Amino acid sequence: MKVFILALLALTATTAIAQLETTCSQGFRQYQQQQQPGQRQLLEQMRPCVAFLQQQCRPLRMPFLQTQVEQLSSCQIVQYQCCQQLAQIPEQIRCHAIHNVVEAIMQQQSQQQRQERQQQAQHKSMRMLLETLYLMCNIYVPIQCQQQQQLGQQQQQQLQEQLTPCATFLQHQCSPVTVPFPQIPVDQPTSCQNVQHQCCRQLSQIPEQFRCQAIHNVAEAIRQQQPQQQWQGMYQPQQPAQLESIRMSLQALRSMCSIYIPVQCPAPTAYNIPMVATYTGGAC
């Protein structure tokens, strides 16, 4: 549900920020030629946002240099599908379905890995999987989840297919908890979650009147990392790719961070920006 709310907010924001195409198209040549110390500090402070917007599991696709329709990331899609499918399985056979997921993942490992401490690894993997699905989906699963009944082959296959999104999500790089099969797993947030948290935290620490400038810095930094031939000539006024990158940056950060950003975000200027404490630690 949260995924759809974010998507709805993003689509709603599209209309509200249409006027950015004019106001955000100016000042990039000036930004390129002259950077104040405060601007450089803002860019450094927004590094987590740069990292997040370029991650594969970003919540919205950020097509710098290309005009594309906003869409949910593959991680969010499979997460939603996983929870939706799990909710449709009766409580009394959810344990069996989760056992099938564990088995399906373990079968994809090499023969040698499956032979080493298979029973212990499966038990630990089962525990981690239960914790992950419970936290992620908020769906009841028994704490002592044991395979309680034998099902027919057709039922087992149906359950396994029904929870395919869960298997996909748990093996994805941006899964909420790392579940290594069959090694001993360790709880840890993914890099995507860390940089998203850092990005929002850093953005919230920047005064409102300077957030437009900071977001311009993010878009500029990303654009400068593209191959020279892709962004050559981008600094001419009214370039569609330039406008689209700013518009998408504003839209994604507004939806993701729930932080006030002006609808008409002005172009960057060369004014001095006061020093802002930079957060350098990891996610809380």
From Swiss-Prot:
Function text: Seed storage protein. Might be integrated via inter-chain disulfide bonds within the glutenin polymer.
Tissues expressing this chain: Expressed only in developing endosperms. Not detected in roots, stems or leaves.
Family named by the database record: Belongs to the prolamin family.
Signal peptide span: 1-18
Annotated keywords: Disulfide bond, Seed storage protein, Signal, Storage protein
Database matches in PANTHER family: AVENIN-LIKE B5, PROLAMIN PPROL 14P
GO molecular function: nutrient reservoir activity
Species, as recorded: Triticum aestivum
Alphabetical list of InterPro entries matching this protein: Bifun_inhib/LTP/seed_sf (IPR036312), Bifunc_inhib/LTP/seed_store (IPR016140), Glia_glutenin (IPR001954)
CDD domains in UniProt: AAI_SS
Top-rank taxon: Eukaryota
Protein name per UniProt: Avenin-like b5
Keyword Iron recorded: no
Gene3D superfamilies named in the record: Plant lipid-transfer and hydrophobic proteins (1.10.110.10)
PTM comment text: Contains disulfide bonds.
